[in-house]
Amino acid sequence: VLPGIDGPMAKPYATIRTGAGVVTDRVSEAASAAGRVFAVDPTSASASCIGGNIAMNAGGKKAVLWGTALDNLAWWKMVTPDGNWLEVERLDHNFGKIHEQETVRFRLKRFDAKSYKPLGEEILTMPGAACRKDGLGKDVTDKFLGGVPGVQKEGTDGLIVAARWVLHKMPPVTRTVCLEFFGQVREAVPAIVEITDYFKPGGAGNAAGVLLAGPERL
């Protein structure tokens, strides 16, 4: 059970702990072997590492359903610029996209580099919507990201050394649909938006219980 969760959501949830240097595909394979899904799947999954995924807030095809790295992190550990340890723990995890949660909380714990003696603890609280930009989603220009350490900072505020991620379950039935568009690219782009909206809350596809697991556009 992840910290800060009460009520119906307070139940054991599958997670996976990884070192920063683990290749993304190896994590996906380990999750798959356990019947689960690791949501972070950038196109560089065969070469990228977990630490880089956090530092870049990586996403991928499954980000449509479960969000980017930030949405799926339960805990991570860093070395700060002063050489001490920092552990960041997501509280009240919604097991989905972070911007859909009204208030988001992180517990930050600092420890001495040599003795691991606690140096301080604080709770970082912010609106979930602050993690995304209206009409854009992931905002790569927002390096501050509400003050959340490590994520999307590209290594500028410390070194990621380990992380724990929530895992998901794919629906029992899946289908792959291929659509062809002809004519100008500008005519295809609105169709992509319409397809995505169709499966969002309020869309007819979503109302029918169908989820969009991931889109690919060529």
For the regions a language model picked out, list residue spans one by one.
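Acidic-enriched catalytic cores of C-N bond-cleaving enzymes acting on peptides and small amides
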Residues: 189-213
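Compositionally biased, intrinsically disordered low-complexity regions
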Residues: 6-9, 211, 216
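Short glycine/threonine-rich loop-to-helix capping motif typified by GTGT followed
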Residues: 56-59, 214-218
